[in-house]
């Protein structure tokens, strides 16, 4: 959520910056609503002052033995008018808040301006794609060859875009998760955190999934006892970041770095027909998430380090990748700046996204009222929040299967994973 004061005082400048990400802010409507808000605010304050002044005169009139009925009637009339104006102002503020909640974050000035993914800027590559002297198989064929990826059973049990994993493929999936968690906790300084897979509406509002992206979520039925329904998490970013909601953190505790391995659930609304084969786009998938809570002046440096932490996973696994900075038109709703890491998939002969690392600056913190207290400051200030995949486990499995395949369809186990697979060097 943008700073409401900034939105009011810098409306034209805000609209211009939002336009670079393809969002058209209705300046005329907001201007009219703001003028109306000011008018109602003044009227409400004047009515309150008048009522208070007249109310004080009641005691004076009583002391003089005067008839106070006319004064009390006047106070009643003012009270009724005040209630009406307050109700009108409340409704208007709710309308302004609803608009503010639908406005995306302002892109950072360092983000390249562009319309879509074609305008993203590659900033580095690591590793060279392997040249195979045989026809490569994709991960679906490899997984089925080793009886490790069972899409048919998943369709029978649940439906499309789900998977049943078995045997050494399932073991490799688990090994990847353990390897990622160990790397981030022992070398990168993150605290492993276990979080709920179901979250409430306040949490989804806090991180920006609601109100705009409700259709992308899986919702439970309304809970009678709780008074509201819960939703399955689309990413561990939601529960991890919301740990800071409605809290004031001491400056000495920052930065806070958390990691969690969870299943994630997405309806993939709007993705009909895209990546229908294999593990690339699933309704349920595992991910190791990285979240950082930092002081504002540290957030851009934190974005660089968080991105490097995700890249290190691919480097240790020996998987070629490239890193791109997203242009303004391709960034997520709450992001001020984003780096995407794309891993090389031989069967597709291209790089595919495996991690998205974003600096949300104070966008989420304002929604959540997540603050910190500096020793030199009189008042708490908003935190900056960052998140990224470290990594998406299923897509990493895809990359390992395809990049480490041999001519006979066997899979060489990357050295980094062998300690997690009982020393196994090859599948098949």
From Swiss-Prot:
Residues that coordinate or bind ATP: 266-268, 353-356
Coiled coil (UniProt feature): none
Keywords: Aminoacyl-tRNA synthetase, ATP-binding, Cytoplasm, Ligase, Nucleotide-binding, Protein biosynthesis
Binding site for L-serine: 235-237, 289, 389
Gene Ontology terms for molecular function: ATP binding; serine-tRNA ligase activity
Pfam family, one: Seryl_tRNA_N
GO cellular component entries: cytoplasm
Keyword ATP-binding applies: yes
Pathway(s) where this gene product acts: Aminoacyl-tRNA biosynthesis; selenocysteinyl-tRNA(Sec) biosynthesis; L-seryl-tRNA(Sec) from L-serine and tRNA(Sec): step 1/1
Predominant cellular place of this UniProt entry's protein: cytoplasm
Catalytic reactions on record: tRNA(Ser) + L-serine + ATP = L-seryl-tRNA(Ser) + AMP + diphosphate + H(+); tRNA(Sec) + L-serine + ATP = L-seryl-tRNA(Sec) + AMP + diphosphate + H(+)
Disulfide cysteine pairs (residue numbers): none
Location(s) in or outside the cell: Cytoplasm
Enzyme Commission (EC) number: 6.1.1.11
Record family assignment: Belongs to the class-II aminoacyl-tRNA synthetase family. Type-1 seryl-tRNA synthetase subfamily.
Function: Catalyzes the attachment of serine to tRNA(Ser). Is also able to aminoacylate tRNA(Sec) with serine, to form the misacylated tRNA L-seryl-tRNA(Sec), which will be further converted into selenocysteinyl-tRNA(Sec).
Subunit (UniProt): Homodimer. The tRNA molecule binds across the dimer.
Domain notes: Consists of two distinct domains, a catalytic core and a N-terminal extension that is involved in tRNA binding.
Name of the protein in its database record: Serine--tRNA ligase
Organism name: Shewanella loihica (strain ATCC BAA-1088 / PV-4)
Name of the encoding gene: serS
């Amino acid at each position: 959520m943008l700073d409401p004061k900034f939105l009011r005082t810098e409306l034209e400048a805000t609209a211009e910056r939002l336009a670079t990400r393809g969002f058209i802010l209705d300046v005329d409507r907001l201007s009219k609503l703001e003028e109306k808000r000011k008018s109602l605010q003044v009227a409400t304050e004047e009515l309150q002052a008048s009522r208070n002044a007249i109310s004080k005169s009641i005691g004076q009139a009583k002391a003089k033995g005067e008839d106070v009925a006319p004064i009390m009637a006047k106070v009643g009339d003012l009270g009724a008018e005040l209630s009406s104006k307050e109700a009108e102002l409340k409704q208007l503020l709710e309308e302004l808040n609803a608009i503010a909640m639908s406005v995306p974050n302002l892109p950072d000035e360092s983000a390249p301006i562009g319309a879509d993914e074609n305008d993203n800027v590659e900033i580095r590559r690591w590793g060279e794609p392997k040249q195979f002297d045989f026809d490569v198989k994709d991960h679906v064929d490899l997984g089925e060859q080793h009886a490790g990826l069972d899409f048919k059973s998943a369709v029978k049990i649940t439906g499309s875009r789900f998977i049943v994993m078995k045997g050494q493929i399932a073991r490799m999936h688990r090994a990847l998760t353990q390897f990622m968690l160990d790397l981030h906790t022992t070398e990168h300084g993150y605290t492993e955190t276990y979080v709920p897979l179901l979250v409430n509406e306040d949490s989804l509002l806090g991180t920006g999934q609601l109100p705009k992206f409700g259709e992308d979520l899986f919702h439970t039925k309304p809970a009678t006892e709780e008074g509201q329904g819960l939703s399955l998490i689309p990413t561990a970013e939601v529960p991890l970041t919301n740990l800071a909601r409605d809290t004031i953190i001491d400056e000495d505790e920052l930065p806070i770095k958390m990691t969690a391995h969870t299943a994630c659930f997405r309806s993939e609304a709007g993705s009909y027909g895209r990546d229908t084969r294999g593990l690339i786009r699933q309704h349920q998938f595992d991910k190791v998430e990285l979240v950082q809570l930092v002081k504002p002046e540290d957030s851009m440096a934190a974005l660089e380090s968080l991105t490097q932490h995700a890249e290190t996973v691919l480097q240790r696994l020996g998987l070629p990748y490239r890193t791109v900075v997203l242009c303004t038109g391709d960034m997520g709703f709450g992001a001020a700046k984003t780096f995407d890491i794309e891993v090389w998939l031989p069967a597709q002969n291209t790089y595919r996204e495996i991690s998205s690392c974003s600096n949300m600056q104070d966008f989420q913190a304002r929604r959540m009222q997540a603050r910190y207290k500096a020793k030199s400051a009189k008042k708490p200030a908003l935190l900056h929040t960052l998140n990224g995949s470290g990594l998406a486990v299923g897509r990493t499995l895809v990359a390992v299967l395809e990049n480490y395949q041999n001519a006979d369809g066997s899979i060489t186990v990357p050295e980094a994973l062998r300690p997690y697979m009982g020393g196994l060097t090859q599948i098949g």
